[in-house]
Amino acid sequence: MWCLLFVVNGGQVVAQSSPLYADQSYLYTPVRLSHGDLERTVRALIDTGCSFCVIDSTFAIDSCGWDRAALAPLHTRAASGARVPVHSGVLERVNFCGTTFIAVKCLVVDLKGKFLHYAPNFIIGENLLSAQPLCIDAPNGRLTVGDVPGENATVLRWQTRESRDGTFTKGIFLKGRVGGKKVRIFLDSGSRYNKVNAALLPDAPRELMELPQADISRRLEVLRVPVCRAVETQVGDYTTRLNFVLTDRPDAVLNFDFLRNTVFVLDYDRREIRIKQ
């Protein structure tokens, strides 16, 4: 996969940037998708929980001119852990944050059929997010390639994990505490909610809430689920308070909520999240 990282402007090398849009717990940025003679610009979801980019199946065929017969069948994992049959294809070009990527592998999924009106047309997965350090400045709505000036207030280092069946690669796993209990945390910016095993918070006040939930294995539905509010959460040396949906899964899941009011650099090469002062 070839990419162009920087442009030269007036003799100076200028890092590329893109607008960043927050919508509840999600972060979006514009990308330009090119396939054959067709070109589309869409608002794409930034998703650290996806190993590969994902394109909605209807959008891929109707708007980007993909040939359904040319798609390759494979399996991937839903957020629930279920093994799900999908397809894959190669998008000729993706321009993401001023960087043009060639021959980008994408999973082709019926996003609109599963997530309904919440579904994006395109999801930016780790195969693009990991190509270069990205500075995410949510307060000012900018996404920039590379680091930014300023001291690091906190550095969060992560580990990765790959599934034996190849359906999941890389991934960001952090060490932390939720409610004072040690836990391994999966950073999934495509998760609508923060989640933690209910057994870690046996005495915490909880309430039942009706929340919309879906993944690529099941259609969107409103479920009545237990929620704990304002739970003290520590990731590395960074401490905050977050709301959690209670589950029976062993790993906690955090989206970008805990970094919402910060400027941070996501660096896959160094396996670091550098929170700036």
Which residues does each PLM region occupy?
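Pepsin/retropepsin-fold aspartyl endopeptidases
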Residues: 11-277
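Bacterial N-terminal signal peptides
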Residues: 1-9
